[in-house]
Amino acid sequence: PISSFFVAGASKRGWTTWTTAAVDSRVIGMAPIVIDMLNVTPSMHHHYKAYGEWSIAIEDYENYNIMEWMNSKEYDKLLKHVEPYEFIEKFSSIPKFLINGTIDEFFVTDSWRFYWDDLKGVKHLQYVPNGNHGLRGDYYNMTLKNLISYYYRVINDIKMPILDWKVHKDSVYVRIDPNQKYSISKWTSNNTKERDFRIWKVGDSSWVQSKIEKNNSGSYVFLKEINEGYTAGLIEVEFNGIEDFPLKLTSGTWIYPDTYPFKEYKPEPPLGTPLLSD
């Protein structure tokens, strides 16, 4: 019988990665891929306030009126059983590698803010610059190699690289163990008109890399860029301590200014029993 395994999957399989790890004690590592919607209710409200619409990528869900059930007792009851965020304490003992795309058709690229701080234990993140929901082309191959590097460390019980980061107001703080072999870059993308970084809004090569000179302390502070419209950014660190198994990790993506162009979604009419009703 199988006594332990590492579970990974993309999109719907990414959701299944979360739910599998929540109930199966044999899971020793996990990598949910392009399913950037943990803590689904605030994530979906974030989605609508950023876009002013539901992305065409989730049209099937819209056609079935799923969003009309949000903020209902029935919807809330369902989430208690199927939303991985409800089982978040189950993941604290499992190494977690979350992989997302910065130009994903489904999800807003700074959705980490609704779950990252609540995830405990060993956790790492990679937002793939210019990676869409399918992480297509070279991005798929590079991401697969990166996932294998993470998997290699888990199954061989190798200490994970230390990368601490925090996005706070106008600044991004990064701390790296200076004894590690690494290189560091900043990636940015600008949309002069909208708070929208989906592939069909910014293209498949809008994220531009700027290499950062290393310092001796391993501590860095970056100011968010002020440009016309909205600017997104992230910090990427490549660790090279293991030959043939480099590992790229990133901070969460930030978007500046951190404002919403649209109001929260209000179903007309809402379905189900309102949460605030008697």
Task: Give the positions of each predicted feature.
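Short beta-strand immediately N-terminal to the catalytic nucleophile in serine-hydrolase-like folds
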Residues: 7-9, 31-33, 99
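Serine-hydrolase catalytic core
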Residues: 74-131, 169, 173-184, 191
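Hydrolase active-site cap/lid region
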Residues: 19-68, 126-129, 134-142
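Glycine-rich nucleophile elbow surrounding the catalytic serine of serine-hydrolase chemistry
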Residues: 9-19
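Surface beta-strand/loop "capping" patches
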Residues: 149-188, 205-218, 223
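Beta-strand-rich binding/interaction modules
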Residues: 182-189, 195-197, 232-235
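Short, aromatic- and glycine-rich surface loops/edge beta-strands on solvent-exposed regions
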Residues: 228-242
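Gly/Ser-rich "nucleophile elbow"/oxyanion-hole loop immediately N-terminal to the catalytic nucleophile
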Residues: 1-11, 26-27
